[in-house]
Amino acid sequence: MDYNYHTHTDRCGHALGEDEQYVKAAIEAGFKVLGFSDHVPFKEVHHPSERMDYAQMEGYLESINSLKAKYADKIEIKVGFELEYFPEFKDYYQELLNRCDYLICGQHNKTLDAYSYDLYADDEDVIIYANQVKAAMESALVSFIAHPDYFMLGRNHWSD
């Protein structure tokens, strides 16, 4: 694989290491493109184990853009965000897209208050999940879908 567009930083609470360490490791591994995609921060809510605090967003963008310039002759670096698609935030997502290279949809939660599909997902939840992912694709804001089978973490079997 020559590229990775789904890289988180320690700001999200579930990754380790400094931003530049990821770049150096990607170069060493022969990557041509490294895309950072930390989880979208929200002013309204902060979940330290899921996403950066809203106040960290500027530092994230500055850090990755600085690395993009520093390593331009060695690797293509992109900066983006991973979002859960909630239509009420469509304008906010567009503002973010105007400031970065791409957005991806990783629909972890049914609602912003962190009802997570990895804990439990019954048949009704799977339909809601599918509709949320479909709406994200139809919005034309996201470039691709991350872990489209995420809802299966909360299920032991496929249903009919």
Name each region found by the language model.
Residues 19, 88-89, 129:
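Amphipathic coiled-coil/heptad-repeat helices and related helical stalk/stem segments
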Residues 75-119:
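Hydrophobic alpha-helical segments and helix pairs
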Residues 23, 56-69, 76, 95, ...:
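Histidine/acidic residue-rich metal-binding segments in metalloenzymes
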Residues 1-83, 92, 151-156:
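An N-terminally biased module of ancient metal coordination in phosphate/nucleic-acid-related enzymes
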Residues 26-35, 95-102, 135-141:
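Short, functional N-terminal and low-complexity linear motifs
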Residues 11-13, 100, 104-160:
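Domain-core and long-helix interface of multi-subunit machines
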